[in-house]
């Protein structure tokens, strides 16, 4: 039961963090678990994906592939 509570808190923190990045239109660097580095502005997200608008394209990234989101 405790694990469920911690998981819910973690998801709320994740949502709040990504929401703030979207609302501020912050430039971010996203590192994937494969080591690939992506830069852009997060425009939307749901439970399993993040949409990143880069300089010349928009990418749909699955959250399980994300290692780190770093505001620039």
What does each model-found stretch correspond to?
Residues 1-39, 43, 47-72:
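Short glycine-rich, low-complexity segments
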